[in-house]
């Protein structure tokens, strides 16, 4: 894929990808609702921008309701690490009335908890669909990331099958095995594989990571991406660029 413009990295932890794009000579900026690492270029309510931009695609296109998408062209690329807090396999366990974390809750509170979580999950699902719709309907290029473990909610009849599933991210230098899906919208991935295995002493378990502090904000520790993985993913699947490290194969 040729990127003549800029890369726009959305949501938490996207700064790692931003930095690696810049190292590869491609201009990049990141956007998020918070700035916990002091490096976010644009602190914005991404959900609001997605909602408003989707409305523009199906209503009057002459509306002056400006969003961040107005400055993104077809020569650019959006890389979105969409919040997985309601889609991950760990999240699906929270939908059970008998989940161990609810053992001290009265039954009426358990029902309210599950119903509230179900409503939030539907809201986030619609936002993800709208983000993909905005890009497909306007021809803007997008790569969306989300977990793809056994019980992941998005396996249950999502609107598109993933373009790529990376079943073991440690093979490309990440901290977690963490099976992950990537959807390429208005573009196609390249198919390289740079083998750079992570030292086993540095591999982490998702279940041991700290949870999120509030709804809509993913766990920082679970969402962490190593710079090595970001660079290898960019070169293997976005740029089709052979590197001088590791071993590159094609499948």
What does each model-found stretch correspond to?
Residues 1-251:
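Conserved active-site and SAM-binding loop architecture
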